[in-house]
Amino acid sequence: MKRVVAIPGWFLLALSIFVSGGWGALALYYSGPQTPVLQAALAGTFAIAALLTLTALGFRRRRWRALAAYLVLFAVLLTWWLGIEPSNDRDWQPDVAKLAYATVDGDMITVHNIRNFAYRSETDYTPAWYDKTYDLSKLEGVDLVAVYWMGPAIAHTLVSFAFAGGDHLAISIETRKEKGEAYSTLKGFFRPYELSYVVADERDVLRLRTNYRKDPPEDVYIYRSQGSIESGRRLFLEYVRQMNALKTKPDFYNTLVNNCTTDVWYNSLVNATHLNFSWKILASGYVPEYLYESGRLDTSLPFPELQRRAHVNTRAQAADTAPDFSRRIREPAANSTQQKPSPKDN
């Protein structure tokens, strides 16, 4: 009986070494010294140490000494990794070179560094930012925007706040990449990217996705949320609080727990009527469906029809640089003859 009990214990120990060894190797590879050769060498060395420890478990006289050495090595690695600090002082890509922030004077919120690039292609653009004051008492609604490029399960989500007079302010939570740095989902688990609140004109952040991103192409859907205006105001102020905090205290992006969709949900916790956490928040492409099932979108239409009407690519391409871009992409699509497939068909 003791041997039967012991086998699962050794199995769990071996599994822990295997998992921690893989994690440690990846952490060194993605977040280690900036020299790629040194990153690879350190990652390989740690992986070999984990494999040698696993091998030593089969030898009674060596296992405890090897295990103790591995635990010390892993503790050193973990201490180093936890000590990595985010920074606002790097050589940033132009699209995230400026951090947005806001000043609050009662209901009057002045947002600084609103991005509004003039695009000629995804990578060819003229940078431009502006400041604008919004009257929070004139907030009219909050839209969820879902952007798909790889099937139904994964989407980039952002919010756009609608104000009287046709003003819209979009806020997209993204990685803040350095020049020459590319995004990697796996890399995003290991603290290589800072977090950024990209506050933008819809002619920038939406038109970039509908009109210029081609490899792969992206499909954009806009849904009007059904929450109260007061909840929308609290949500806007929470976004302001978070973007201001990042300006003075940077934070890391994380692929799983600190990303474009989880942070939208975290920010929504400011309202008592927030949705409970769901696996559909992690599988972000299903967030619109989750909101629909929870009564937070227009339920007078079947969801497939609501989704069809929410697709804005054709209207955005037609509107292009028009001053009333935000109004035109939201024009009713009920009579449209276009049969845009759902993200499930992408």
For every predicted segment, state its role.
Residues K2-T53, R241-N346:
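Activation targets extended, charge/polar-rich intrinsically disordered C-terminal tails
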Residues G44-L71:
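Cytosolic-side transmembrane helix boundary signature
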Residues R62, A69-L71, P94-K98, I114-Y130:
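Juxtamembrane/interfacial segments around transmembrane helices
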Residues R62-P86:
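Internal/C-terminal transmembrane anchor helices
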Residues P86-D105:
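Alpha-helical transmembrane signal-anchor/signal-peptide segments
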Residues V104-M108, A162-G166, G227-G232:
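A short, structured loop/turn motif at beta-sheet edges
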Residues I109, I114, R120-P217:
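Glycine-rich catalytic cores of cysteine/serine-nucleophile enzymes that process amide/ester linkages
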Residues F190-V270, N276:
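Soluble catalytic domains of enzymes that build or remodel membrane lipids, polysaccharides, and related
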